[in-house]
């Protein structure tokens, strides 16, 4: 037997750690610190945008939520401050009360303005020291009818001027401006008179605008009657409306201007009470003057 062929080379020993995938018997855990090497010898790029998106989203969502919450709080504070400042100048919450009407109230109120002679109860109803809304009390003042009547008066005036070939935007604008100016002058004169007479009343400026604006209902009726039946119809209807508004104003304002005496349940006599009565009658008597002054030139 050949000596060279019978000689076997000793087996080659593999160096420790040459194969990272095979663990030694005494090693409890695999050593993965090196990590598998990707094919092609390329290593992962840690600056890849795909790995940064979750972190950016995690950081950006709290910031965006905080910004939205901060912005909404600023908006709510600004709205609250603006509402307070507006309410100081114009009592919006109180003005809403004067527009709380419905169709039934409007119909009954116009009927009361045209035919107030059969009405008995003129007291304004209260609920917990607060007057009820106009739609629940026909005696409560409102702004819906005066505003709509003023606008309708301007439209009817334009129609009357058009039938007489005198219509122009300038003339209609002057008509609206003069009517509004006279209304403001009337309200200011009443406020000054109440101040000079030192009347302790619950009448507000908005109440005076409402009561003095009711005369436009009669003015509209007079002008329409003049367009349909001529001057005769105009004078008859306007005279009826003037008497009705005088009666309505006396019965309504008497309770407002004499509210101090009515609250005490006694009839106050003397010079002060006479001034109050004269003031009530003067406010009522001036209504027909304005009704005629603002409508006579519209009927020919």
Swiss-Prot record:
InterPro entries xrefs: Yif1_fam
Residues annotated as transmembrane: 143-163, 179-199, 206-226, 228-248, 279-299
Region feature Disordered, mapped onto this chain: 1-46
PANTHER family: PROTEIN YIF1B (PTHR14083:SF1), YIP1 INTERACTING FACTOR HOMOLOG YIF1 PROTEIN (PTHR14083)
Pfam families membership: YIF1
Disulfide bridge map: none
Membrane association type: Multi-pass membrane protein
A Gene Ontology term for the protein's cellular component: COPII-coated ER to Golgi transport vesicle
Family note: Belongs to the YIF1 family.
Primary localisation category: endoplasmic reticulum
Its biological purpose: Involved in the anterograde traffic pathway from the endoplasmic reticulum to the plasma membrane and the organization of the Golgi architecture.
Keywords, in A-Z order: Endoplasmic reticulum, Golgi apparatus, Membrane, Protein transport, Transmembrane, Transmembrane helix, Transport
Location of the protein in the cell: Endoplasmic reticulum membrane; Golgi apparatus membrane; Endoplasmic reticulum-Golgi intermediate compartment membrane
Signal peptide: none
Cytoplasmic compartment segments: 1-142, 200-205, 249-278
Membrane is among the record's keywords: yes
Extracellular side: 164-178, 227, 300
Entry keyword annotation includes Protein transport: yes
Listed name of the protein: Protein YIF1B-A
GO biological process: endoplasmic reticulum to Golgi vesicle-mediated transport; protein transport
Biological classification of the source: Eukaryota, Metazoa, Chordata, Craniata, Vertebrata
Superkingdom of this protein's organism: Eukaryota
């Amino acid at each position: 037997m050949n000596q060279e062929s019978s000689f076997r080379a000793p087996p080659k020993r593999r160096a420790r750690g040459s194969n990272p995938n095979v663990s030694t018997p005494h090693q409890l855990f695999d050593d993965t610190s090196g990590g598998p090497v990707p094919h092609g010898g390329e290593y992962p790029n840690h600056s890849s945008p795909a790995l940064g998106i979750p972190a950016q989203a995690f950081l950006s969502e709290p910031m965006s939520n905080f910004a939205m919450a901060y912005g909404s709080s600023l908006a709510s504070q600004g709205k609250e401050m603006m509402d307070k400042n507006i309410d100081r100048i114009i009592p919006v919450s109180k003005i809403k009360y004067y527009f709380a009407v419905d169709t039934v109230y409007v119909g009954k109120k116009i009927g009361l303005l045209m035919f107030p002679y059969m009405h008995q109860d003129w007291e304004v109803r209260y609920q917990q020291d607060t007057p009820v809304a106009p739609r629940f009390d026909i005696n409560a003042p409102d702004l819906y009818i005066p505003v709509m009547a003023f606008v309708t008066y301007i439209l009817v005036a334009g129609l009357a001027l058009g039938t007489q070939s005198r219509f122009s935007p300038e003339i209609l604008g002057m008509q609206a401006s003069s009517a509004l100016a006279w209304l403001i002058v009337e309200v200011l004169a009443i406020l000054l008179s109440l101040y000079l007479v030192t009347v302790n009343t619950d009448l507000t400026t908005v109440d005076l605008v409402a009561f003095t604006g009711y005369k436009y209902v009669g003015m509209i009726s007079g002008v329409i009657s003049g367009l349909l039946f001529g001057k005769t119809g105009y004078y008859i209807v306007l005279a009826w409306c003037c008497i009705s508004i005088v009666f309505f104003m006396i019965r309504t304002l008497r309770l407002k201007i004499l509210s101090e005496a009515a609250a005490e349940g006694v009839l106050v006599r003397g010079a002060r009470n006479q001034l109050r009565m004269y003031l009530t009658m003067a406010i009522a008597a001036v209504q027909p003057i304005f009704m005629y002054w603002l409508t006579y030139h519209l009927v020919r």
